[in-house]
Amino acid sequence: MEESWDFEFLSRMVDSLVSFLSEFVDDWLANDMRVAVFKILFSWLVVSLVAIHFAWKVYGNTVNDMYYRQGTGGQNGGTPDTHLSGWESAAGDAMKTHRE
């Protein structure tokens, strides 16, 4: 009983996909305004992704090295991490440390 339901569901999904694709192809061949806008936006997306890919190939190591820079400074080579909030630094109190 369950097999017929699964087959029916799968058949409906395939029919829906085929009808969507046939309608899409008909619109594509009609070359109306919606298709022109879709082509422009899709080509912009593809060109942007290709540009990002090539930029990452060229500058990826530099960006990675800048992020994981080793040095005497803070976590990423910047200022040291002090973890002082505005209240502690304004009061001028020294940071309390745990002593055993």
From Swiss-Prot:
Membrane topology classification: Single-pass membrane protein
Cell compartment(s), UniProt: Membrane
Signal peptide (from-to): none
GO cellular component, one term: membrane
Entry keyword set: Membrane, Transmembrane, Transmembrane helix
Family: Belongs to the TCTA family.
Name of this chain's protein: T-cell leukemia translocation-altered gene protein homolog
Gene that produces this protein: tcta
